Amino acid sequence: SDFARMPKPILKDNDLIQIINDNIKLVSELDRNIRIPFKTYSKKIIFKGDKEQLSRVFLNLVKNSIESIKQKEEKNPNFSKEISIEIIENNDHINITIIDNGVGFDILSNNIKDILHPYFTTKKYGTGLGLSIVNKILNDHNGKIEFIKINDGAKVEITFNLNDS
């Protein structure tokens, strides 16, 4: 499977802000009606990582947000669609938060932990590999991901620990 064949990351200095911006441009093509504000507090955040794999993480997460928003739009066509992204660098870690106002994690009720397991899916045609691959990439980059229920949508937090790298 794709999952077993994940290549080892090739770690090089990359600008996380640039990687996220590139992926925002990419997904903006999918739906021009979704606002994607990106809040940064520095010009660059250099991080030792695999550019391709990190791109895959952000692309996957933002695409999930878009699908969630589209699901909500079927029932409520007139809401203002938004995915907000924020990146903050502290001394020993980098935090990235992605918040969307889609259908949220309610469908998961108690299964929010299962979301990272291979082949677990709530989508009609989902493979259940997306988030497990995201999780593997983040683990390989000394990162972790958390899924947080919020009132009107979903919140995903990624933390890269800079101490052990």
Go through each PLM region and give its residues.
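A conserved beta-strand-to-alpha-helix junction within the catalytic ATP-binding
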Residues: 10-24
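Conserved catalytic submotifs in the C-terminal HATPase_c
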Residues: 35-45
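ATP-lid-like helix-loop hinge signature
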Residues: 66-91
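Short alpha-helical Gxxx[C/S/T] motif in the catalytic ATP-binding
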Residues: 130, 134
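Short conserved segment of the HATPase_c
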Residues: 105-118
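Conserved micro-motifs of the catalytic ATP-binding
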Residues: 6-9, 46-49, 122
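Detector for a conserved hydrophobic position within an alpha-helical segment of the HATPase_c
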Residues: 138-139
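Conserved glycine-rich
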Residues: 143-144
